[in-house]
């Protein structure tokens, strides 16, 4: 049976895992790393880069490097490269395509299905965008599950005792808190809260602004206006943040960061953990609001939580850990890898769906209330937040005016009393209502939330039986046609990437063939080898060198094949000469070794390890 992968599609980094027997295993990518930077870049020659290689060139190519695209999921944001505009779904699909390809290489089989995680506080539009990204990448997304829930699944799979846990998930761009009850193989979310605009990126930004302000005061130059300098500053800020989790002081040294009339200027700053904590104190405090909200919604006190799980790389920040410790009055649980646990949970859920893991039931909730706009601009809730999903709820409404023959259903998500202050998910019209006094027609509005947290709405005139149904498509969602077009483009880009890689391999092989051929010619000197064989190799080297100067890859390949053939003949001649010269000595040695009384003797051989 084909494997289903679990993917944590993160703001900063992404991770892939798969079930290996009864245990989830994180898969290394092509570079040998367990996490892949969620970075996409386009070179000036049109090549697409994803992951570590894209992140590495960001300083020299800031305008064409895309980071933290997850923060724009479900919005109308576009990335403009040359004459093309890419949606967040398309950029995310490029990341997913790499994760998929690397997993296929590691597992040695084709991957077509996945479970992808999203922040618990993602809206319907953001969830739909994530699912679309998976589709564009050539994946059937079996389930969209919440990151904290996935983490709890990975933590609690082998835990037999009943317990109540709180997952504190602070990632690169989002923050979630979920409270779950675990017991008897059931994982039930009872409350969730969060902030989709709070994460490690914001902590980095505080360091960037602090350093840029100090530099501007000293040199009169605002580094934030220089894209290359700003990218260097961002990378240095992220590095400093990470270092300050294990040391109390770090140095930020950026030579030649800018130029003045007097010449180059450098940045050499020291940042202490105390200063970093001062710069980010309000961000740490901002995590406490959703934490209190989740506890309030669950009707619990901090002391009633058995374990607090820290998830997401940003929970390594000491001030964050201290805030959690102080709030709950206990040490947070650190027995899980905060970077990998979400992907591992997704892999477990994938195995549950496929039937490979049994006796596990996952009950998640909707993070925000859902409803429609009614008379006076009021937001009327049909499904309250923290309702277990999947769920279905219906309510009867009527017309607001005499003789009204159609109604507009304005679907919203949020917690405010007035519709104008909540997020619009979509609108649709139910028409063909027979004219009648207001309040007489009966219109049944039904909300249906599936296991992915995606909303389906229907409106039915009970008098005529006429019904209108929609799966919510926000204004930022991609249409079926747009998704199909994006899939074709993604496939074309994948083919182009493969072609470029193959071309690079052909050129590398040609270069290596020339090097080895020239080395072989030197080795053949003075060995009495037929000069015509040496001349043949020399004659075959030049066409390869000439072909490498051009763009015709087939010419390079053909020239390399001819060189390889000539090298083979020369190598055979050298081998024959060397072999015949050593025949006599070898025979004598064999005789000596074979002499004696016919007894054999065991010998112990030690292999010298050249790497040591």
Swiss-Prot record:
Keywords: ATP-binding, Chaperone, Nucleotide-binding, Phosphoprotein, Stress response. Pfam families: HSP70 (PF00012). PROSITE patterns: HSP70_1, HSP70_2, HSP70_3. Residues 579-612 are annotated as: Disordered. The modification Phosphothreonine is found at residue 174. Induction: By stress conditions e.g. heat shock. It comes from the Bacteria. Residues 603-612 have a biased composition (Basic and acidic residues). Gene3D superfamilies: 1.20.1270.10, 3.30.420.40, Actin, Chain A, domain 4, Substrate Binding Domain Of DNAk, Chain A, domain 1. InterPro entries: ATPase_NBD, Chaperone_DnaK, Heat_shock_70_CS, HSP70_C_sf, HSP70_peptide-bd_sf, Hsp_70_fam. Residues 581-597 have a biased composition (Gly residues). Signal peptide: none annotated. GO terms for molecular function: ATP binding; ATP-dependent protein folding chaperone; unfolded protein binding. Belongs to the heat shock protein 70 family. Acts as a chaperone. This is Chaperone protein DnaK. The lineage of its organism: Bacteria, Bacillati, Bacillota, Clostridia, Eubacteriales. The gene is dnaK.
């Amino acid at each position: 049976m084909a494997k289903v992968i679990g993917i944590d599609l993160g703001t900063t980094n992404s991770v892939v895992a798969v079930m290996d027997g009864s245990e989830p295993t994180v898969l290394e990518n092509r570079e040998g790393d367990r996490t892949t930077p969620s970075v996409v870049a386009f070179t000036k020659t049109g090549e697409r880069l994803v992951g570590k290689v894209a992140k590495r060139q960001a300083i020299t190519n800031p305008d064409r490097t895309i980071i933290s695209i997850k923060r724009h999921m479900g919005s109308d944001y576009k990335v403009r490269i040359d004459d093309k505009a890419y949606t967040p779904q398309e950029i995310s699909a490029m990341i997913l395509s790499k994760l998929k390809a690397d997993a296929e290489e590691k597992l040695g089989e084709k991957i077509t299905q996945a479970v992808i995680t999203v922040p618990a506080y993602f809206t319907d539009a953001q969830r739909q965008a994530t699912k679309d990204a998976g589709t564009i990448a050539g994946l059937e997304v079996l389930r969209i599950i919440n990151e904290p829930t996935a983490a709890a699944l990975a933590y609690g799979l082998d835990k037999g005792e009943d317990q109540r846990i709180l997952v504190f998930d602070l990632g690169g761009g989002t923050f979630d808190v979920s409270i779950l009850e675990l017991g008897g193989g059931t994982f039930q979310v009872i409350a969730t809260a969060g902030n989709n605009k709070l994460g490690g990126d914001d902590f980095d930004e505080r360091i960037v602004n602090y350093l840029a302000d100090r530099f501007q005061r000293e040199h009169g130059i605002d580094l934030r206006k220089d894209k290359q300098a700003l990218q260097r500053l961002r990378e240095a800020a992220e590095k400093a943040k990470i270092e300050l989790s294990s040391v109390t002081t770090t140095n930020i040294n950026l030579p030649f960061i800018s130029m003045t009339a007097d010449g180059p200027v450098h940045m050499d700053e020291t940042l202490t953990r105390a200063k970093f904590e001062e710069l980010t104190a309000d961000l740490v405090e901002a995590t406490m609001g959703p934490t209190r909200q989740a506890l309030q919604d669950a009707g619990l006190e901090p002391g009633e939580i058995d374990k607090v799980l820290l998830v997401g790389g940003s929970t390594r920040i000491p001030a964050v850990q201290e805030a959690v410790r102080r709030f709950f009055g206990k040490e947070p649980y650190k027995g899980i890898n905060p970077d990998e646990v979400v992907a591992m949970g997704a892999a477990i859920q994938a195995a549950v769906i496929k039937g490979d893991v049994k006796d596990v039931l996952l009950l998640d909730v909707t993070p925000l209330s859902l409803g429609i706009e009614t008379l006076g601009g009021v937001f009327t809730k049909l499904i309250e937040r923290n309702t277990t999903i999947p769920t279905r709820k219906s309510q009867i409404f009527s017309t607001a005016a005499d003789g009204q023959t159609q109604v507009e259903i304005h679907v919203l998500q949020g917690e405010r009393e007035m519709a104008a202050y909540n997020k619009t998910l979509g609108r649709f019209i139910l028409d063909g209502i027979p004219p009648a006094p207001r309040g007489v027609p009966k219109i049944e509005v039904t909300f249906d939330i599936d296991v992915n947290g995606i909303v389906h709405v229907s409106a039915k005139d009970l008098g005529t039986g006429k019904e209108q149904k929609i799966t919510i498509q926000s204004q930022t969602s991609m249409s079926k046609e747009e998704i199909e077009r994006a899939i074709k483009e993604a496939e074309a880009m994948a083919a182009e990437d493969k072609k470029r890689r193959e071309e690079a391999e052909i050129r590398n092989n040609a270069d290596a063939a020339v090097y080895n051929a020239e080395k072989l010619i030197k080795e053949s000197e003075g060995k009495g080898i037929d000069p015509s064989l040496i001349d043949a190799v020399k004659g075959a080297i030049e066409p390869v060198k000439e072909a490498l100067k051009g763009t015709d890859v087939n010419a390079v390949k053909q020239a390399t094949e001819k060189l390889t053939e000539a090298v083979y003949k020369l190598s055979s001649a050298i081998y024959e000469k060397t072999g015949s010269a050593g025949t006599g000595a070898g025979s004598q040695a064999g005789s000596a070794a074979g002499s004696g009384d016919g007894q054999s003797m065991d010998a112990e051989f030690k292999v010298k390890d050249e790497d040591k």
